[in-house]
């Protein structure tokens, strides 16, 4: 059985969404299952449903834009986070931010203003940037067939709280090329941890924390996909701090080794000197 655009629109409505939300969607097209028209139909449904609000999809380029390949072109640089964002960024009416490694594409009346100024950021999720502002606008995050390991907003929480050992000490000199060809020099510190190169893989620990009472996330039905929709921390960052700290901090006696996402030291990041 293949799903249709009407099926997808109904599923979004059944989630309790109105279409007026500011919503950031992390997705896996494969997880949705067969859809008549494929990825284009999924995007048609999302753009129609959220036309009154603001639809945001990450169009990250961190896998390819770096010191060795420093030029990000907002019009042509392909994203590295899936087929839906890659097709979405090329659609008429969609605006893409100028962040060289963690750009976001948006569709809606507020897209231009919401995404403006990202060429001025110097970290992936700089406080005051697009990810951080989700909490200020009462935004939502929809995870379609992916886990919290792909929830970039958690990086934003860490940056707001100044969690140490999350960013490289030295910045890369990058360039963001705008739609008119003008270039902006950006000095960007990338995500980096010497003992744990795959920081986000431990973000799945937040699933249990955020589904505890009172729940911050809830499971939703969207065809064959596994979905979760957490509020973008509508509370102050300080409210999110103890949850993030307790969920991500390994036990002091823990000595795991080997494999992706493993902790190779008892404590591979230290929660101290953070700012509220």
Regions found by a protein language model. Name each.
Residues 66-156:
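Internal, conserved structured core segments that host functional sites
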Residues 18-68:
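N-terminal active-site beta-alpha-beta segment that forms phosphate/nucleotide-binding
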Residues 1-7:
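N- or domain-start disorder-to-order transition segments that initiate the globular core
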Residues 140, 150, 155-179:
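Active-site beta-loop-alpha substructure in enzyme catalytic cores
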Residues 12-22, 135-136:
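Glycine-rich phosphate/diphosphate-binding loops that line cofactor/substrate pockets in enzymes
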Residues 52, 165-195:
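Short, flexible loop segments at boundaries between secondary-structure elements
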